[in-house]
């Protein structure tokens, strides 16, 4: 039992006495308190606590009786407080004087609550865009180089995948078509067929989910028999202006079907201004352009090209995509895209080019996107499958790092899996 008594050195008078239940946290303790409330007359009251053990309460004895303790308290003779408790260090730890530091940054990291309070970068499902591969068939076909990804049947499989993504908060997707070889040509005319695979998929999705945000890829490589992003001249040169003409028709066709954001990934010069003019001329002023501003000629695209069977039939893409060694060149592309009317600037790939993401973030007021490409995805998946890394932790860290570098949105094949983690669900 715990008795609390208020004592003064002058005349005192008991006002009332009550029993109260003591609480520890949210659970009632086994100890009870008897409280005497007294009115002070001339001198400051002192509080003396007398404790006895009813439950598992540890009280260190002072060697004095209760009466002696109360008398000592009335006389002002309080014992020295015990030294603060400190956890013991491991055996062999040297005994050193504390460093004379005025600033110890670890103080702000010492508890989960403090770490959460001071976190500078956050990630949510609204920051994620899910790339989806579609094809003309009805069956979902697994992509060997990208575990967990499929070429989705453009009707049932696509709708089911979008439903699952929306269920965890991902409401933005980007479509990439696998075009049959029979429909490919050197000029890529299938790219602007209003009844083609992509326009049909857009209309289907908008009919089922009117509020979904659909990004589309504007480039000729899925439709080209040569596998390049533009029309190839007989000497192997990619024809810039003629390709831009085709891209404008492709963007208008996608907008007509209901695309919210058209995304030229071709890296032709002047294509953003031409596409903007073409969209406006057809009454699609509200359709946004996400320009692949800094798209590098990267080796990280391999699994993607397998998924779409869009590898170049000859040569490479170094005459139009950027050199991985270049940094300042991204500023040239940024300035051009801003002047030409881009609404969003994208860097691709993401993780190996975080310095470029930060460069664009620091030099443009436009939203910045980053594409965590197929090679990045597959490396994390492979490391997780081999138990070399914790797949989920590496996935979340990689996305957070892309956000920290300055990306407002991230195109990632992890979108649904990451969103499931963010909302506390296991990805299905």
Predicted features and spans:
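N-terminal chloroplast transit peptides
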Residues: 1-39, 51
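Low-complexity, intrinsically disordered short peptide segments enriched in small/polar/basic residues
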Residues: 11-12, 17, 21, 32, ...
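N-terminal organelle-targeting presequences
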Residues: 34-100, 105, 132
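Alpha/beta enzyme core
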Residues: 82-90, 96-99, 111, 120-129, ...
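Glycine-aromatic-enriched surface loops/turns that form tight recognition elements
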Residues: 106-109, 118
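N-terminal [4Fe-4S]-dependent radical SAM core
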Residues: 114
């Amino acid at each position: 039992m715990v008795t609390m008594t208020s004592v003064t050195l002058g005349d005192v008078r008991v006002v009332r006495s009550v029993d109260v239940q003591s609480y520890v946290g949210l659970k009632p303790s086994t100890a009870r308190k008897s409280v005497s409330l007294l009115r002070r007359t001339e001198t400051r009251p002192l509080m003396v606590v007398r404790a006895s053990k009813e439950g598992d309460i540890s009280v260190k004895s002072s060697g004095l009786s209760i009466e002696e303790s109360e008398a000592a308290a009335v006389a002002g003779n309080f014992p020295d407080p015990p030294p603060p408790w400190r956890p013991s260090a491991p055996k062999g730890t040297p005994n050193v004087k504390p460093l004379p530091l005025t600033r110890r940054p670890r103080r702000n990291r010492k508890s989960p609550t403090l770490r959460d309070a001071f976190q500078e970068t956050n990630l949510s499902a609204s920051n994620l865009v899910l790339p989806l591969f579609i094809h003309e068939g009805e069956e979902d076909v697994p992509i060997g180089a990208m575990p967990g990804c499929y070429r989705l049947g453009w009707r049932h499989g696509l709708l089911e995948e979008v439903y699952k993504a929306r269920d965890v908060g991902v409401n933005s997707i980007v479509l990439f078509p696998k075009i049959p070889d029979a429909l490919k040509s050197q000029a890529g005319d299938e790219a602007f067929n209003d009844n083609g695979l992509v326009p049909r998929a857009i209309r289907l999705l908008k009919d089922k989910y009117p509020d979904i945000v659909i990004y589309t890829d504007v480039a000729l490589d899925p439709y080209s028999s040569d596998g390049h992003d533009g029309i190839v001249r007989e000497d192997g040169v990619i024809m810039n202006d003629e390709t831009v003409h085709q891209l404008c028709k492709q963007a208008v066709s996608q907008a007509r079907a209901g695309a919210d954001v058209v995304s030229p990934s071709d890296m032709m010069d002047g294509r953003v201004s031409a596409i903007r003019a073409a969209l406006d001329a057809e009454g699609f002023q509200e359709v946004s352009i996400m320009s692949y501003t800094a798209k590098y000629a990267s080796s990280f695209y391999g699994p993607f090209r397998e998924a779409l069977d869009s590898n170049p039939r000859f040569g490479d893409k170094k005459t139009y995509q950027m050199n991985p060694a270049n940094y300042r060149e991204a500023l040239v592309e940024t300035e051009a895209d801003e002047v030409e009317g881009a609404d969003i600037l994208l860097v691709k790939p993401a993780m190996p080019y975080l310095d470029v993401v930060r460069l664009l973030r620091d030099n443009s007021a436009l939203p910045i996107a980053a594409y965590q490409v197929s090679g990045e995805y597959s490396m994390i998946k492979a490391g997780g499958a081999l138990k070399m890394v914790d797949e989920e932790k590496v996935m979340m860290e990689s996305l957070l790092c892309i956000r920290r570098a300055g990306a407002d949105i991230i195109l990632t094949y992890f979108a649904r899996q990451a969103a499931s983690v963010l909302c506390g669900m296991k990805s299905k």
